[in-house]
Regions:
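N-terminal Rossmann-like NAD(P)+-binding domain of SDR-like oxidoreductases, especially those catalyzing
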Residues: 1-92
């Protein structure tokens, strides 16, 4: 079993990637900052299904915070990092 880190795990793509990895028998650590750019209740709903899985754990953290990011990586090693965290719908 490989341990995956999935950032942006409460988003649509992140939650579905995490679910697929769990179905394939892997351990998944999810990170998301649960910002209010769009409904945090929707993000928490997606997380609720993942949190029911025994091989899933979640850390609420902002990857823009260097200390929080360092803590995620110092807590345990990962075989694979899937970085999906982003500000959705940003237009400049």
């Amino acid at each position: 079993m490989k341990r995956y880190l999935v950032t942006g795990v409460a988003g649509f793509i992140g939650a579905n990637v995490a679910a697929a990895l769990l179905r394939a028998g892997h351990e998944v650590v999810g990170v998301d900052n649960i910002n209010d750019y769009y409904d945090p209740l929707l993000k928490r709903y997606r997380l609720s299904a993942l949190l029911a899985e025994s091989h899933f754990s979640f850390t609420e953290a902002d990857l823009a915070d260097a200390r929080a990011t360092q803590a995620v990586f110092s807590d345990r090693p990962f075989h694979v990092v899937i970085h999906l965290a982003a500000q959705a719908g940003v237009r400049y």
